[in-house]
Amino acid sequence: MRIGIVLVLAGWVFAGGEVAAQGKCDRACLEGIAEQYLDALVAKDPKKLSLASNVKYTENGQRLQLGDGFWNSVTGRGTYKLHVADQTAGQIVTFSTMREAGNPMIIALRLKIDGSRRLTEIETLVAHSEGGAKNLETIGQPRAAFLRATPPADRVSRAELVRVANMYFSGMQLNDGKGQYPFADDCDRLENGGKTTNAPGRGGAPKPDPKTASNYSAMWTCREQFESGLLHFVMRIRDRRYLVVDEERGLVVAFAFFDHDAGASRQFKTPDGRSVTAGPVVPWTWEIAELFKVEKGLLHEIEAILERAPYGMTSGWSSWEDGMSDKIQFAR
């Protein structure tokens, strides 16, 4: 890690405490604000919202006037919804299926409020994944672990929750199979509603051996994927913004970008020394919002919303230097 995690997170906790000092908005309050936003979005009426004079809105990394972009094309709400509230930082992230021109799709929405409960930051990741939205709506409800409180005796600090979540990104970036991967045995990951771990083989195909395969498999466990060393082509995971943390439930939401440079990172060696060529053949980037469930220092559940973006895309919230860095960033 290129920075002092403890120092950065200490500043982040202080920044979150500023909102709390002004007048805390609890879980129900934050969820109510998110619901109000989604209703105003479908009504195409930003005037229904309580907005700060300096409110900032981005959509897939682009700064827009509030009411533009997805506000023009949205036609309804879907049936899947997952709220993650950070009462300390005054922020909430919502994963939700929606309708755009009548078609199912997914959004990851981040809202930040001030001490008067006015919206100051609105960030939307719009994922045009009709199949993913249908998958989530077939699942119906968020996985129980995301809604379950961690026993008080097992709760840890915000800094510790972020530290464990960040090990996921650090372990995937230029993955070599030799890192420390804090996965629980029951770890599972959904990506735009689809299983990317522990998935059944298509047509009854057998599970490949992680120790001899040349491409990683969605049939493997979280740990098997990382220990295979076959994710090396994820050249960089940057602009890692850990903006919402729920200590009560052991949840962390990060926004980030996964870069595939299509260059030398495609040629690498597996942990046992085999030479492999894998990964995208043209440069491109995933823009991603990723939710982690952490218990007793291990990752149990992971859920991601992502959309393909131009290579090197930035979030619209970070400086150029921070947007290109893999350091931990925190709520301001």
What are the residue ranges of the model-derived segments?
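Bacterial N-terminal signal peptides
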Residues: G4-A15
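C-terminal and inter-domain tail/linker signature
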Residues: A20-R332
